[in-house]
């Protein structure tokens, strides 16, 4: 590590919910290490591309992280790159940690390529969530005797097995 600040990039879209606690725990550990080294910390929720990235004392950063929660939509990480680039240009030497949910929303390689360019020679550590792949249910069609939904998978390979439990407005099971 360096003596420069720590920048924590945090995936916080819908796909991060399954492994949210693990990501917050990892952020806590990173912040504790920065605190021991008396380093400032910048928290960058990747769902907020227009948010100004600012350096804070470790204690403040810890509170900021605990106030975050997963957003109920997909996050376009790419849109955050300009703000990250501005911050890195202004702050110079720093360590960067990306607490990834491991989900590619379609522009993952574009984000990684862009991040690689702006990070330059600064240390970058990517933490994968280690959680089971996320799924989303979309296009629900409710018919008289059945309900059909489409399942979106976070990663394209293989076949998944699982159970979907559907409830009506009165909390009674459907199907």
Q: Which role fits each region the language model picked out?
A:
Residues 1-175:
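N-linked glycosylation sequons
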């Amino acid at each position: 590590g360096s003596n420069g600040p720590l920048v924590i990039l945090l995936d916080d879209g819908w796909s991060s919910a399954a492994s949210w606690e693990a990501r917050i725990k990892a952020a806590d550990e990173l912040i504790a290490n920065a605190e021991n080294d008396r380093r400032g910390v910048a928290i960058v929720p990747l769902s907020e591309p227009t948010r100004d990235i600012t350096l804070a004392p470790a204690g403040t950063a810890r509170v900021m992280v605990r106030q975050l929660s997963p957003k109920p939509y997909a996050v376009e990480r790419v849109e955050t790159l300009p703000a990250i680039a501005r911050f890195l240009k202004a702050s110079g030497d720093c360590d960067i940690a990306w607490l990834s949910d491991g989900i590619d929303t379609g522009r993952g390689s574009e984000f990684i390529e862009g991040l690689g360019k702006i990070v330059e020679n600064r240390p970058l550590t990517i933490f994968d969530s280690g959680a089971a792949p996320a799924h989303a249910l979309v296009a629900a069609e409710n018919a008289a005797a059945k309900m059909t939904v489409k399942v979106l998978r976070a990663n394209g390979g293989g076949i998944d097995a699982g159970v979907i439990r559907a409830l009506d407005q009165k909390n009674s099971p459907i199907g």
